Regions:
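Post-signal peptide N-terminal segment of secreted/secretory-pathway proteins
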Residues: 59-61, 69-75, 91-98
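Bacterial Sec-dependent N-terminal signal peptides
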Residues: 1-33
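Acidic/histidine-rich helix-loop elements
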Residues: 45-65
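Short catalytic/ligand-binding loop motif for oxyanion handling, primarily in non-cytosolic enzymes
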Residues: 48-50, 92-96, 142-145, 255-258
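Hydrophobic, often amphipathic alpha-helical segments used for membrane interaction and targeting
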Residues: 95-238
Length: 278
């Protein structure tokens, strides 16, 4: 009987220790989570000239559009960013900040520099007293239309079905629907399903394209992955601290890739965009 009591007591003690270790582990996990740099990773369409194969119509010179963009900037500003990154090549950061300085001196005059950069990012920076912006883009050409350059021997049916009706799986998120406000377009773009769709549309769909023994489509898709990895690498070059709050404004497909990378990151914690886009 004494042996039984001893064994039972030992078991209870062991369970208590395990519970304590588990609790400590959870606390450490929460602590590590809170130590990560908060990032608001925001998807947009290009509000100025773009080389994108399909673009949303938007007149950046239109006064109402400029006012609507400013309202978006005010929503985003509630995040309180200390660092702002935009889809401008890192090599053009000096020009970027020259234009930003001009805007700070005359904020009542809308800037259309790189479209959404001038209309949204500059205003977010002004409201939050951010001294300078960072360009993190890396230009890398790839062939969206590789299917037109060869006889597709892989799976032309799947590829063509997607191209003929790309929004078939997410009709409720079609950003080309007429009558949508700017806020609604951006709300749809930042929906997780739409971001997944953008990775499919810009890269993964090309894996269905290729010659009999070739990987032409996959190779083009790899170029787009490469571009986004380099954008991520440019982000990682920035001298950030754990106290920084980072706002990234870029075309939707880049937002989608960066989300994928940062969700696995030991350094960043992506916040919910819809806490600010309301």
């Amino acid at each position: 009987m004494k042996h039984l009591i001893f064994i039972t007591a030992l078991f209870v003690l062991s369970c208590n220790e395990k519970t304590q270790h588990t609790a400590q582990g959870n606390l450490q996990e929460d602590s590590q989570e809170s130590d990560k740099i908060k990032v608001l990773n925001f998807a947009t369409f290009h509000m100025g000239n773009t080389s994108d194969s399909k673009s949303v119509e938007f007149d950046e010179q239109n006064r109402k559009n400029q006012e609507d963009a400013k309202k978006i900037a005010q929503m985003i500003s509630a995040f309180g960013p200390t660092v702002i990154c935009v889809e401008v090549p890192a090599s053009e950061s000096e020009e970027l900040n020259t234009e930003y300085t001009k805007y700070l001196k005359s904020p009542n005059k809308a800037s259309t520099y790189y479209g959404e950069v001038g209309l949204v990012a500059f205003e977010v920076g002004r409201i939050n007293n951010v001294e300078k912006l960072y360009g993190i883009d890396y230009r890398l050409e790839y062939n969206y239309n590789i299917n037109n350059d060869l006889k597709n021997e892989i799976d032309s049916a799947t590829f063509n079905n997607f191209q003929s009706n790309p929004f078939a799986s997410i009709p409720e998120l079609n950003i080309f629907e007429e009558g949508l406000s700017l806020a609604e377009k951006l709300s749809r773009m930042n929906h997780p399903k739409f971001l997944d769709f953008l990775i499919t549309a810009n890269a993964d769909i090309l894996t269905y394209v290729g010659s009999k023994n070739g990987y032409e489509g996959a190779d083009e898709a790899a170029e787009y992955y490469k571009r986004n990895l380099r954008i991520y690498s440019n982000l990682n070059r920035l001298p950030l601290t754990k106290k920084d709050r980072v706002f990234i404004l870029s075309g939707g497909s880049h937002t989608a890739f960066l989300n994928e990378f940062m969700q696995r990151s030991l350094k960043y914690e992506v916040v919910n965009t819809f806490d600010y886009l309301k």
